[in-house]
């Protein structure tokens, strides 16, 4: 569902909200360096780029040349560096789970006024999750 919401443009990021309401601060709540858009938040924010790089694939999101969220989502559906279907599915699932975690972290920073704790997100969604072989546990089916 998260991947679909990003691709369809249904994420309530600050760039979208500011078109209708004067929200004041339009900057990314995680890095405070750029205007918050879906593409920035999920792919180019320095905080989230570190999380992608911490994955077992060592993804450097800025090296893929995404120019839109459609490019970003298409990358997960057809990754250029993976041939086996099971590995493609694993990357897609990882992308969806990490995007969900990024969105939850963003909302905690904005609405719960919690400090940014990247280390916790990396532990929860990063390489440790994938080293546990939870895909083989039968809990998730693609």
Model-assigned labels for residue ranges:
Residues 26-35, 73-88, 113:
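Short, conserved non-catalytic motifs in the polymerase core
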Residues 79, 116-142:
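RNase H-like, metal-dependent ribonuclease domains
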Residues 31, 35, 102, 106-114, ...:
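Residues that mediate protein self-association or partner binding, especially
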Residues 86-102, 108-112:
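Short flanking/linker segments adjacent to small metal-binding domains or redox-active Cys/His motifs
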Residues 1-35, 101:
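Helix/loop segments that flank and initiate small ligand/metal-binding modules
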Residues 32, 46-49:
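Cys/His-coordinated zinc-binding microdomains
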Residues 36, 50-53:
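Short functional micro-motifs and their immediate structural scaffolds
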